[in-house]
Amino acid sequence: MKAVLWTKYGPPDVLQLKELEKPTPSDNEVLIKVHATTVNRTDCATIRAKPFFMRLVTGLLKPKKQIPGTEFSGEIKAVGKNIIFFKTGDKVFGFDDQGAGSHAQYMTITEDKALTIPDNITYEQAAASTEGAHYAYNFISKVDLKKGQNVLVNGATGAIGSAAVQLLRYYDVNVTAVCATKNIELVKALGASKVIDYTKEDFTKNEQKYNFVFDAVGKSSFLKCIKLLQPGGVYISSDLGYMAQNIFLPLMTPIIKSMLGNKKTVFPVPTHIKRSLLLIKNLMEQGKFNSVIDGRFTLDQIIEAYKYVEKGHKTGNVIITVEHDSKT
């Protein structure tokens, strides 16, 4: 099979497309013929091992898992003897933030990281639905939102931001989305009630006050956004921030929040992937959640895909279409 091989940390150029043996599922795994995967921010951070402490998970000196990729969709071709919920021929999708090995024609994974694809959803839509929504849901669920409150989403057209805008609709809050001019109509369609065009104004100088500011691209900071928050307001970033400040500041704000007007920042660790997948599957089945797709690459173009995502200007998700010939 064709697979992207990743044997050392570094920029996208360290990735190599190779011919490898098709994996064999263990007793607790399924073998998936991959039809679509993505390149996302998680993948880009992982191949570089930045920040450095990621290596505690991915491997200290070199990658433990040598095929990258976290999101996937495809068809089950074999199941281990302990598999209960899937059978050969099932169309499935899923996500593993610690590495699914999905940048390949075939992959294996445990059944808790996958779900069947709704009948009304394509392989591409399914593959692009998980990473952003998983992070967005985990972050949003850490805030006690109430009907009619005001929420600002910076980076509203990335994978995480576009998912957040859609999920926030179900809390019946007023969403202000920050995006570029070209994406104004998109974020309105996703559910934003107000839009700030960052090419024309600095959203941190906005006079509106918010109960929750969600920086879905990690390009701002708690200190820059603190004046946007109402008393008791919360700032969350999807990024560690400069010198990992978004980890350390949440440890400090409970102590000094009285001096900050009871404003605080938190940095939730995303958990419960299966819970996120079930939510997104349910919303997709009802036509209430749509994957935003920026563009498509092939496995042969994997380096170009990573470089494109690293530029930080994608709209939604970047798809990798995985082609198969009669032999695969």
Describe the predicted segments one by one.
Residues 127-197:
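Mid-domain Rossmann-like dinucleotide-binding core that forms the NAD(H)/NADP(H) cofactor-binding site
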Residues 11, 20-73:
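N-terminal glycine-rich beta->alpha transition that marks the start or flank
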Residues 220-289, 322-328:
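Glycine-rich phosphate-binding loop and adjacent beta-alpha segment
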Residues 288-295, 306-328:
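C-terminal capping/lid region of NAD(P)-dependent oxidoreductase domains
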Residues 71-98, 174:
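A glycine-/small-residue-rich N-terminal strand-loop-strand element
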Residues 204-212:
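A short acidic, Gly/Pro-enriched loop at the edge of an enzyme's catalytic core
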